[in-house]
Each structure stands twice: as C-alpha cells, then as structure tokens.
Amino acid sequence: MALKTWLLCLLLLSLVLPGASSRAHQHSMETRTPDINPAWYTGRGIRPVGRFGRRRATPRDVTGLGQLSCLPLDGRTKFSQRG
C-alpha cells in the first residue's frame, strides 16, 4: 500500500513540475525592458545576438565566391605551383 501511495505522489509531482517551469519561462519573457533600441548598437562594434537575432551573411561578407572550384580526387591530378 505504501508503494502505491509513493507512486501516486511521484505521478502528481511529475504533472505539477512541468507546469511550474513553463510559467517561470513565460514570466522571464515578460520582464524584458521594452525600451531597448537595437539601432543604438549599430556602428558600436556590439552584436547583441540573443535578443535581436543572428547577423545574416551578405554577399559582400563572403570573399572568394567566384574562386571556388571542384577538383577530382583520383590521385592523378597535378597541381600547379603558380597559385
């Protein structure tokens, strides 16, 4: 009988704990300061990744895009020393 009571308590506890953690997460989302301006960070060398998202790569950030080539991997390829 004590084992059944113990298992019932564990079951009830497992049902209660996920609800408490989700409420805590929602609460932390509500306490953000709404007056933060992402434009303030522009030109200052600061990248706030967590709040405003990751920076997307632009074509000017990618160097050597036209220099990519495919080389065969059969071992018979002679590489030029000219670079």
From Swiss-Prot:
Organs and tissues of expression: Widely expressed, with highest levels in medulla oblongata and hypothalamus.
Sites of Phenylalanine amide modification: 52
Propiece residues: 57-83
Record's signal peptide: 1-21
Protein's UniProt name: Prolactin-releasing peptide
The organism's place on the tree of life at top rank: Eukaryota
Cytoplasm is among the record's keywords: no
Localization (cell): Secreted
Organism name: Rattus norvegicus
Residue stretches in coiled coil: none
Record PANTHER family: PROLACTIN-RELEASING PEPTIDE (PTHR17206:SF1)
GO CC terms: cytoplasm; extracellular region
